[in-house]
Amino acid sequence: MATPSMMPQWAYMHIAGQDASGYLSPGLVQFARATDTYFSMGNKFRNPTVAPTHDVTTDRSQRLMLRFVPVDREDNTYSYKVRYTLAVGDNRVLDMASTFFDIRGVLDRGPSFKPYSGTAYNSLAPKGAPNTSQWIVTTNGDNAVTTTTNTFGIASMKGGNITKEGLQIGKDITTTEGEEKPIYADKTYQPEPQVGEESWTDTDGTNEKFGGRALKPATNMKPCYGSFARPTNIKGGQAKNRKVKPTTEGGVETEEPDIDMEFFDGRDAVAGALAPEIVLYTENVNLETPDSHVVYKPETSNNSHANLGQQAMPNRPNYIGFRDNFVGLMYYNSTGNMGVLAGQASQLNAVVDLQDRNTELSYQLLLDSLGDRTRYFSMWNQAVDSYDPDVRIIENHGIEDELPNYCFPLNGIGPGHTYQGIKVKTDDTNGWEKDANVAPANEITIGNNLAMEINIQANLWRSFLYSNVALYLPDVYKYTPPNITLPTNTNTYEYMNGRVVSPSLVDSYINIGARWSLDPMDNVNPFNHHRNAGLRYRSMLLGNGRYVPFHIQVPQKFFAVKNLLLLPGSYTYEWNFRKDVNMVLQSSLGNDLRTDGATISFTSINLYATFFPMAHNTASTLEAMLRNDTNDQSFNDYLSAANMLYPIPANATNIPISIPSRNWAAFRGWSFTRLKTKETPSLGSGFDPYFVYSGSIPYLDGTFYLNHTFKKVAIMFDSSVSWPGNDRLLSPNEFEIKRTVDGEGYNVAQCNMTKDWFLVQMLANYNIGYQGFYIPEGYKDRMYSFFRNFQPMSRQVVDEVNYTDYKAVTLPYQHNNSGFVGYLAPTMRQGEPYPANYPYPLIGTTAVKSVTQKKFLCDRTMWRIPFSSNFMSMGALTDLGQNMLYANSAHALDMTFEVDPMDEPTLLYLLFEVFDVVRVHQPHRGVIEAVYLRTPFSAGNATT
């Protein structure tokens, strides 16, 4: 929202402009100019980096920042309260705008924290490749039950010989001359899994011996992808220990590594000629999968031949960090946890709470008007929530794969045949004989060299779509894999992580050639995503581990306090800080962090504050002038709005709203959007037990994304005045936001938004009214404004009515890339190459009949309808100022919103843009008085 249109009508009080110079009376302005040569006040009276050049009597006046330690603290289950005594000495002025809370504590982000995609363990392994493993097969014979141990895997380390001592890996030639003592593998860590043949060349024809390691049947099988077992010795060995019973009676039980050797010979070897070719060192290890899970499991967890084919998938990334600008950390708008700023002489609290003020959102929009939110500022944790536009709106322009991509075997040829050398017989020119000068075994390949083709571009694009779009589809589109048990609580990380989705829902051929967002994804919060760059940055500021000793600096946001000049006296300043991890922390998956084990504790909260580095006589003059009630400090809330939440039941389409009769003086208009009930906490309570969510909170941080669900809004005052005038495209008193069927051509920009609504938004945001369409100036087009976030889209789909050969083939019966992809699952490819039966071609000579679909998205911003007294002038838009009908009488207001149905309860978030100001008066030492004025909704004060 652009700054100028966001500010109230200044004429109501003695405020003249947007910077703090407008807060001052002419006398104070004159004083500032007179002292400007040796102390520049600048905006908001402060320039704390410039020290005075003369008249300074103490070194304390030069000190820029002081630390206040709390005089009292309360550490409760859900909150942490601190109280400070601010002693402002004579001839000093404390700048509240420079204060911040310096907080130290310990954060446990819980087991659901995973700050990266993929796995850190064996990430190059195929998803379905097992570790070298063993399993037991039980056979019921006629007379007895037999059990056999089966092994699958690889022995990679070459040795000189295999004896009962194991694999010989070398010789000790330092013994007596002529003797060579064999060196055998140290079974605690050898053969090492990372050691094998150094080259592909092995054509000498000798029968080598090999050794390797294998997991015993007692260690449950897991795919190699994601497998980790902690080392149990400094050489990297991983075997567990096993108990060894004493050999003598009364002896002590000991432990040894749980490692055994198993020897293997070729299957064709016969008794009497058996000799070991392979030895496997089998062991039990502490096998775990810290960052992956199984998505294909043919049987139960017991080891079996079928379970060799288990398939792994990495756990979903879940960044967890403090919210943007520490949203949610400090209590605002909460009756039971209201802050206090009171003079100790009067004990009047200058912080008056109004439930319908939104301090956090106001601060977000204020920052956006001041600077570039895309530039991060780590001190205040300023890294705005964002999303990858390519994920929200998919521009599927296909893949550039004109040339095939090959991969080749390591020797560049592939497996060959073994040939012996021959030559022409010397006595017979037509015969052949063995050539003794040529080796008897020559490996030669015929024909072209072996190659495999992989479409790298297609695989990258398909993988991007699955990881970034398909996995974030609503849960109704997902399923739980067979033989996998997930918790019943759908808000937990384990549940969200374990659910999988068919890649066919979001494949590379879906909407190919179109710029379109998936319809089921439109109502999914796009900021709850691992590509939320701001959240990722804030998460990484804390580090990459679960347990964090944090040290943060948090600013005060309440508009009546944050810019105050505190005059000499003694004051009580206290505030509450939340300990609810769902409110304080943000996760990219939005899981319930309370259930998933995250905790936060504070060890200290100190206050840092700055005194103006003024000369004493300058400060005393400033104090004398500010004590005068004509020089009260006035501040207005940037948003200057009363916010109201109206529930919208699931599948409802109409929301009527009534505001009782009142005088609408100083009213500036409406802003509105839609929120999900699940994503909106109750700010009035100290702890909301029903808030089981930790993603972005649009109500507080401005991550709105449901604006496209509004269809119409009708506004009627009881005076029955058709206030918007009669020169608009549509009927007065009704704004049509989008039209599905547009026979008259009222829509704009190749989408279903009406020209009427587009112009109203341009007018409300940039003052670009009915005089045409043009791009707003850069300084007005901020991150939260309309034009930057307006995204029109259109696509063609098959005309199911007029295309006579159309068949509605459902997802299980569609095939495309058959034989090269898994069937309805992110698992091993299956099937056979065959012509695709989906989608129908929309281009070329065989293009089928199609219809055009249009829509738009407009995230982050709020829809705005400006209001002026001129609208009450019976339809004529004039510049004659306030109409008497409007200014001197009260009116009731009825509004009706028409919205798209959603299958979950939502809220209409409606801002009445009013005049929200506080005047702070400090007549005597230790006395602070505040008067809040907000017409036409409410007012309050701290003077009685």
Swiss-Prot record:
Statement: the UniProt record of this protein carries the keyword Protein biosynthesis: no
GO biological process, one term: symbiont entry into host cell
Induction: Expressed in the late phase of the viral replicative cycle.
Gene3D superfamilies: Adenovirus Type 2 Hexon, domain 4, Hexon Major Viral Coat Protein, domain 2, Hexon Major Viral Coat Protein, domain 3
Residues carrying N-acetylalanine: 2
Subcellular location: Virion; Host nucleus
Main location: virion
Cellular component GO terms held in the UniProt record: host cell; host cell nucleus; T=25 icosahedral viral capsid
Task of the protein: Major capsid protein that self-associates to form 240 hexon trimers, each in the shape of a hexagon, building most of the pseudo T=25 capsid. Assembled into trimeric units with the help of the chaperone shutoff protein. Transported by pre-protein VI to the nucleus where it associates with other structural proteins to form an empty capsid. Might be involved, through its interaction with host dyneins, in the intracellular microtubule-dependent transport of incoming viral capsid to the nucleus.
Miscellaneous notes: All late proteins expressed from the major late promoter are produced by alternative splicing and alternative polyadenylation of the same gene giving rise to non-overlapping ORFs. A leader sequence is present in the N-terminus of all these mRNAs and is recognized by the viral shutoff protein to provide expression although conventional translation via ribosome scanning from the cap has been shut off in the host cell.
Protein name: Hexon protein
Organism of origin: Human adenovirus B serotype 3 (HAdV-3)
Gene name, Swiss-Prot/TrEMBL: L3
